[in-house]
Amino acid sequence: NGKGNYAEAQPFGGPKEATITIATADMDEDGSMDLVLANRDGQPNYIYFGPKFVKKVPFGTGSDESRDVDVGDMDGDGQLDIVVANIGERNMIYYGSKKGSYDRSKAFGNPAAATHSIMLADLDRNGNIDIVVGNKGQRNHYYLNNKKELMQYTFGQKDGDTYGVTIGDLDGDVYPDIVTANSGGWNIIYYNRTLK
């Protein structure tokens, strides 16, 4: 309300929805922010459309084990796409269309991976959105995107348990750096030196 109070609470979804994380974006370009949910326990992932958050559309297989989600225009067509981190299956990009569907998709990563965190940023500053994933029990990856394919690169500890990833220019050189939140070990900043 402009005074630092959050008195109003609006439930949405269902009481048994096993949601792990939520991304916000105007998916249908109507001027209202929408909510993009990543669900676990084999439940469908959903987009809830603002401003009322009652209308929803599913995306994904309908039985994914998703752990994180981010949104960005991965193929440069002007439509927002959804990038999902999964465990026990490959991570996915669901491409948005002008019709509001997300039927076109691309899988990436190891099907045996346990990806718990995902973040999008233009790591090499070439105008394309790239992907960073944080994995449990194995090394992390980033994927450079040239719109036709994703080129995989490895970083991080061999047996690390990364549950969170964020990206930002921490040293002021205009190139995005990667920060990982790790369970049972040091949290680590990876400075972007090789992509300059």
Question: Which residues fall in each region the model found?
Answer:
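Blade-level signature of beta-propeller repeat domains, shared across WD40, Kelch, NHL, RCC1
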Residues: 164-170, 175-196
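Glycine-aliphatic tripeptides that mark coil-to-beta-strand junctions in extracellular
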Residues: 31-33, 78-80, 127-129, 174-176
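Short strand-connecting beta-turns/loops that link adjacent beta-strands
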Residues: 3, 29, 40-42, 52, ...
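Short coil/loop residues immediately preceding or within conserved phosphate-binding loops
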Residues: 19, 42, 66, 88, ...
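Structural signal for beta-propeller blades
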Residues: 43-46, 90-93, 139-141, 186-189
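Hydrophobic beta-strand segments that make up the repeating blades of beta-propeller
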Residues: 35-39, 82-86, 131-135, 178-182
